């Protein structure tokens, strides 16, 4: 099968877990003898092509007023101009059509489409190619993709959100198949009226198993190393992590570490340092896991999936988090996940991680996820329709 996968970013560009999930999915499909082309954005001015781990990748310039992934602060008017164009980016539609007509895919699989905009669905339809879309964030509801604003989760049924997503919802009628990366995000889009003509399902993200020895054992029994990894932001709960660190700052036996991108204009960086958090910077997941015993993720937004939760469990860690979005589903599948409303840090650091059985690991293997997407592709191509 010839599959064109569209995602905002692809290796080496990365801002979160979606890029990792899309890359693992693309590589698994390529190993299963599909011809896969990934279409993604680049900050460069020219198109370029690479082959990464057996997957062909086409990088195209973003046709908008700035590159939004460089961490640089933009003015209010720059942001307004960018987002207005991103509601339906005609230039990116033309770019997508050119790639589709050259590659001639059997199916276009869209994922995160900020930058491309929903115009890529129109491009695929104009070329007579069927579309499957996977929601990995809340971009279709709100331009910040998090449905989290000024410290609060936004109501998808509010007048403001319904107005913001009206055009995107209308364009979603063009999509033939829809997948959410958790039951939560799948139901949220379905209940809001997105993808009325599509077959709906949910497929979890790929999370490869890791070799892990004795995850419940502490390197220093007298010091409990508490870790946070991810974006240093309020929706990820990093402010609450800092508050927790401040609370334990003068108590012996606790050390707090945080891994993520450090930007000096982020007020939470100073808050972290003042609270006694050791900032590790942007390091690999493996390096982070070697330096912590318990992972604390006080997420406030509705995590579409919760990739870091699964990765932490697979590295033999106990996770303390909040019951938000897809994380609640993961707790029903995986051991060693505890919720902050039910247990304290003092208690959770005493828990040893339970071993993982093969059946648990099988839920997230690249081959299994690729098989599930193959079935979703076949359903779309065979014109099956389901509610």
Predicted feature locations:
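Nucleotide-activated donor-binding/catalytic signature segment of Leloir-type glycosyltransferases, i.e.
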Residues: 266-283
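Glycosyltransferase donor-sugar binding loop
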Residues: 229, 233, 254-268
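Short hydrophobic beta-strand element within catalytic cores of glycosyltransferases
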Residues: 318-321
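Acceptor-binding helix/loop patch of EC 2.4 sugar-transfer enzymes
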Residues: 67-82, 133-171
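A short, active-site helix/loop in glycosyltransferases that binds the activated sugar's phosphate group
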Residues: 162-199, 207-209
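N-terminal subdomain of nucleotide-sugar transferases
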Residues: 1-58, 246-250
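A conserved mid-protein helix/loop that constitutes part of the nucleotide-sugar donor-binding site
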Residues: 20, 228-247
């Amino acid at each position: 099968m010839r599959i064109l996968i569209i995602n905002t970013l692809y290796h080496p560009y990365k801002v979160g877990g979606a890029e990792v999930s899309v890359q693992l999915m693309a590589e698994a499909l390529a190993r299963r003898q599909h011809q896969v082309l990934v279409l993604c954005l680049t900050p460069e001015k020219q198109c370029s092509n690479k082959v990464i781990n057996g997957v062909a990748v086409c990088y195209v310039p973003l046709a908008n007023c700035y590159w939004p992934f460089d961490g640089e602060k933009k003015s209010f008017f720059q942001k307004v101009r960018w987002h207005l164009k991103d509601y339906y980016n005609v230039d990116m539609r033309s770019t997508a059509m050119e790639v589709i007509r050259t590659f001639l895919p059997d199916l276009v699989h869209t994922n995160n489409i900020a930058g491309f905009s929903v115009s890529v669905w129109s491009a695929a339809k104009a070329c007579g190619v069927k579309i499957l879309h996977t929601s990995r964030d809340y971009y279709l509801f709100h331009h910040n993709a998090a449905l989290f604003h000024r410290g609060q989760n936004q109501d998808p049924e509010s007048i403001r959100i319904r107005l913001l997503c009206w055009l995107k919802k209308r364009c979603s009628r063009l999509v033939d198949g829809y997948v959410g990366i958790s039951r939560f995000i799948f139901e949220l889009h379905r209940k809001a009226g997105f993808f009325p003509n599509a077959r709906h399902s949910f497929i979890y993200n790929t999370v490869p198993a890791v070799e892990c020895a004795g995850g419940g054992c502490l390197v220093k029994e007298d010091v409990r190393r508490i870790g946070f990894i991810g974006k240093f932001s309020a929706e990820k709960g990093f402010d609450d992590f800092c508050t927790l660190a401040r609370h334990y700052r003068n108590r012996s036996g606790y050390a707090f570490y945080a891994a993520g991108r450090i930007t000096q204009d982020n007020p939470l960086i100073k808050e972290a340092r003042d609270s006694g958090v050791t900032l590790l910077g942007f390091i690999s997941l493996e390096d982070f896991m070697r330096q912590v015993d318990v992972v604390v993720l006080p997420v406030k937004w509705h995590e579409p999936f919760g990739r870091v939760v699964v990765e932490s469990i697979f590295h033999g860690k106990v996770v303390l988090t909040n019951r938000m979005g897809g994380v609640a589903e993961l707790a029903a599948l995986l051991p060693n996940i505890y919720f902050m409303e039910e247990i304290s840090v003092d208690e959770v650091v005493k828990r040893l991680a339970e071993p993982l059985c093969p059946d648990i690991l099988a839920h997230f293997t690249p081959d299994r996820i690729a098989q599930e997407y193959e079935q979703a592709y076949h359903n779309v191509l065979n014109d099956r329709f389901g509610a």
